[in-house]
Amino acid sequence: MTLQQIKEIYSRPLTELILQALEIHNKNFGNDIELCSLKSIKTGTCPEDCKYCPQSGHYNTSIEKHKLLDKDSILAEAKNAKDAGSKRFCMGAAWKHIPKKDFDQVAEIITEVKNLGLETCVTLGSINADEATKLKQAGLDYYNHNLDTSREFYPEIITTRKFEERIETIRNVANADINVCCGGILGMGESLDDRFNLLLELLQLPAAPKSIPINTLIPIKGTPLGDKYTNAQIDSFELVRFIATTRILFPQARLRLSAGRENMSLETQTLCFLAGINSIFYGNKLLTENNATVNSDNFLLAKLGLKSNAELC
């Protein structure tokens, strides 16, 4: 696949593009939506300078910071998520690299969440090959490490971690036989070509991502992008085109509509489902930011006749 071929797919008439994406989606997945819950298990004081992130220690934001939560409180959240219908419990920690003093505790938490009957996913920053192997042994199913944007635009967003470092972490995850969860963020001021190049980078990862989060910027006061923009710099039709193109390029990946969904109309979310989305974060909170409410999600899924994969088990 070349950059030009990706452009040609994206540029098709919208109805034709959505139809092809929907046909591919139905062939591989059918009518189910994966419900995932996301918990911030360590919040704030991150040494990274990601310009979109309120958890960066470089910026003055209003988030409530805390160290790694205790195991019992995390397990209680996981049980609640399962009872609410989630299939996967994702845990995020604001680290550039997991501290040695916390590694064993995180591994133990993964094992106990797995024992609840949930799929496990973590995002802990960079990990080396040995750490990836130990997380696999603990029962980890997915490791999230987003590319965020194209290689070319990346230095405009982050300077404390090189793009190639992200690729190396994904290589370590894949070599440990952990499923790769990797996507990006739209609406940070990037060009269309940057979005196409992000897709090309995802195609060229050491292992094909089994899960692709598609985020739109949530401008948060105190962050450089939050102070620059009041809304994500992408319209609904561009988002739907991007999702449909992603579905065509990744027919067997779960595409997750992630950050920014709270600000989308039900009609826009419906188009996203038609274009290939088959996973959402379910719950009123998304790390430090509000998410679409459980009630609104239940209403929309019922309105569209979509079933969660928990209901189909």
UniProtKB/Swiss-Prot annotation:
Q: Which reaction does it catalyse?
A: (4R,5S)-dethiobiotin + (sulfur carrier)-SH + 2 reduced [2Fe-2S]-[ferredoxin] + 2 S-adenosyl-L-methionine = (sulfur carrier)-H + biotin + 2 5'-deoxyadenosine + 2 L-methionine + 2 oxidized [2Fe-2S]-[ferredoxin]
Q: What does the record note about the cofactor?
A: Binds 1 [4Fe-4S] cluster. The cluster is coordinated with 3 cysteines and an exchangeable S-adenosyl-L-methionine.
| CDD domains found in the cross-reference section | Radical_SAM (cd01335)
Q: Name all Radical SAM core domain ranges.
A: 28-258
InterPro entries linked: Aldolase_TIM (IPR013785), BATS_dom (IPR010722), Biotin_synth/BioAB (IPR002684), Biotin_synthase (IPR024177), Elp3/MiaA/NifB-like_rSAM (IPR006638), rSAM (IPR007197)
> Under which pathway is this protein filed?
Cofactor biosynthesis; biotin biosynthesis; biotin from 7,8-diaminononanoate: step 2/2
Task: Report what the protein is called.
Answer: Biotin synthase
GO MF annotation list: 2 iron, 2 sulfur cluster binding; 4 iron, 4 sulfur cluster binding; biotin synthase activity; iron ion binding
* Species of the source: Francisella tularensis subsp. tularensis (strain SCHU S4 / Schu 4)
